[in-house]
């Protein structure tokens, strides 16, 4: 057996562990994980641009995969998520656009009534023998007459004039709106 003096020098002897020590352990802070349930695979989005990949046009609401939205549409700024606030804003914008379209159509109808109540625009031309005139009456001629008599600007591309090469009465059409076409009477005479 070992001598008592020896026992005090060896750390592994029973003398070194005569009283039980409490082991100190440090605990890491606990991380609480809460399950979110199933992740939505699709997202409702409003397109800001025309997108060929999904055959969508600006302003359309579409259902797209979450990854496509997160990785392609969102970084490029081509779509926003459809939320109740965005939906309400979109409806207000749609109502404003519809009111503007209605106002433009009413103005076009009013202008068409003005053109039809005027009677006939008189177009002077230099004439030849009989009913023949020199040159022809073009859309630009009609636009100039309307501007001088009514102080209204009309785009000549919207005016459809039949081929006029003789003195007489003619009817021209002015497309003021996709739904409104005004018929204008022309009286061509020689000077």
Curated annotation (Swiss-Prot):
Record keywords, A-Z: Chloroplast, Plastid, Ribonucleoprotein, Ribosomal protein, RNA-binding, rRNA-binding, Transit peptide
Tree of life domain: Eukaryota
PROSITE patterns: RIBOSOMAL_L9 (PS00651)
GO biological process entries: translation
GO molecular function: rRNA binding; structural constituent of ribosome
InterPro entries hit by this protein: Ribosomal_bL9, Ribosomal_bL9/RNase_H1_N, Ribosomal_bL9_bac/chp, Ribosomal_bL9_C, Ribosomal_bL9_C_sf, Ribosomal_bL9_N, Ribosomal_bL9_N_sf
Subcellular location: Plastid, Chloroplast
GO cellular component, one term: ribosome
Pfam families named among the record's database cross-references: Ribosomal_L9_C, Ribosomal_L9_N
Complex formation: Part of the 50S ribosomal subunit.
Function recorded in the entry: Binds to the 23S rRNA.
Alphabetical list of HAMAP family matching this protein: Ribosomal_bL9
Descriptive protein name: Large ribosomal subunit protein bL9c
Taxonomic source organism: Triticum aestivum
